[in-house]
C-alpha cells in the first residue's frame, strides 16, 4: 500500500511508471518531455476521478485510490477485499492519498472516517459506469487472445466498456461489438473512467502488482482473465471485416519471418530455403492430383515470404 501527499497544482507532475515497471514510489518529479519515454500504456489522471463527501476523491484507475484533503483533522482509511473479507490496509493520516498495492481487479470496499464518523463507504460497483481496459500496441495475436476476457468483464459488471488498442485491431472488432467503445491510446480521455485495467505481459512484476499470477504459469491468453477477475475458460472473439474477401485468388501459403522476441525466432541457417523448396514442390504435386484440371483456380501461387 502506498500513501503520500498529493501534489499541489504548482508541484511537478507525478511520474507514473507504466505497466511492466512496478514502483513503490509515491511521487517523483517528471523528466523533461525530450527525455521521458512514451508510456507503454496510457497514464491515469493525477487525481482520482470520483467525487465523494467532505472533499474526498476516489477511483479505481490505478488500483483503488483515495485523495484526502487537509481539513485540519485526522482521517482513517480502510481498504478491504469483499471477496475474501481481508482488510488490506488501515491507516490514520491528516491528508494526502492512499493507493492500493494491487492494480489488477479486486472487489474493493473503501471506508473513510473523520473523527470517528464514517464519511464514506463505497463498494466497487462498475454497473452503468465507464471502465477502460487497455491493451499494448504492436501485437496482434496477444490482443485477439485477450479481448474476449474484456467482453466477459463487461457482461459480468454491466459497465460501459471502452477498449484502448492499436488502430489496425479496432477494425477487427468495432462492427462485431457495437456496444463497446474502441479508441487508440491517443484518444483515451482518462478523466472519464471509474476504473481502468491494463492487460499486458508483465515480465518483471515480481511483487505481483499488475497481475495476480505469472502469465508464464497460467498461459499467455488466460492471464487476461486473472487480471480482470473473470472465468478463464477460452472463448474466441468475434471479428467483422468490411472486406473479408481473399487477398489472392489462387491458393497460397503465408510464412512470417518476424517475431517480437529472440526466443521466437527460427535461427536455422537453411530453414527458410528448405521450407520454400518444400512448399514449391508441394504446390507442383497438387497440380497432378487426380481431378486437377490445370485451371487457374486449382493452381497454387508461388510461395512468397512476408517481410
Predicted regions and their residues:
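Catalytic machinery of carbohydrate-active enzymes
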Residues: 2-307
Amino acid at each position: 500500500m502506498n500513501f503520500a501527499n498529493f501534489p499541489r497544482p504548482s508541484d511537478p507532475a507525478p511520474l507514473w511508471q507504466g505497466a511492466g515497471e512496478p514502483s513503490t514510489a509515491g511521487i517523483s518529479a517528471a523528466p523533461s518531455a525530450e527525455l521521458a519515454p512514451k508510456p507503454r500504456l496510457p497514464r491515469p489522471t493525477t487525481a482520482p476521478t470520483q467525487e465523494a463527501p467532505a472533499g474526498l476523491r476516489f477511483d479505481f484507475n490505478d488500483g483503488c485510490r483515495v485523495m484526502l484533503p487537509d481539513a485540519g483533522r485526522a482521517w482513517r482509511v480502510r481498504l478491504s477485499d469483499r471477496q475474501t473479507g481481508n482488510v488490506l490496509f488501515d491507516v490514520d493520516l491528516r491528508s494526502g492519498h492512499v493507493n492500493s498495492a494491487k492494480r489488477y481487479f479486486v472487489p474493493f470496499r473503501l471506508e473513510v472516517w473523520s473523527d470517528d464518523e464514517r464519511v464514506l463507504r463505497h463498494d466497487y460497483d462498475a454497473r452503468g459506469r465507464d471502465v477502460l481496459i487497455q491493451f499494448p500496441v504492436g501485437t496482434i495475436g496477444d490482443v485477439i487472445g485477450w479481448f474476449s476476457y474484456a467482453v466477459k468483464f463487461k457482461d459480468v459488471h454491466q459497465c460501459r466498456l471502452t477498449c484502448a488498442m492499436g488502430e489496425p485491431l479496432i477494425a477487427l472488432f468495432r462492427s462485431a461489438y457495437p456496444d463497446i467503445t474502441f479508441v487508440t491510446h491517443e484518444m483515451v480521455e482518462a478523466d472519464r473512467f471509474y476504473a481502468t485495467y491494463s492487460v499486458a505481459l508483465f515480465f518483471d512484476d515480481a511483487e505481483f502488482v499488475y497481475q495476480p499470477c505469472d502469465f508464464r504459469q497460467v498461459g499467455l491468453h488466460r492471464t487476461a482473465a486473472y487480471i480482470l477477475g473473470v472465468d478463464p475458460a477460452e472463448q474466441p472473439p468475434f471479428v467483422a471485416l468490411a472486406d473479408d474477401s481473399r487477398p489472392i485468388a489462387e491458393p497460397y501459403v503465408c510464412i512470417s519471418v518476424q517475431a517480437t522476441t529472440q526466443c521466437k525466432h527460427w535461427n536455422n541457417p537453411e530453414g527458410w530455403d528448405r521450407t520454400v523448396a518444400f512448399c514449391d514442390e508441394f504446390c507442383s504435386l497438387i497440380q497432378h492430383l487426380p481431378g486437377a484440371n490445370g485451371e487457374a483456380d486449382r493452381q497454387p501461387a508461388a510461395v512468397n515470404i512476408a517481410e
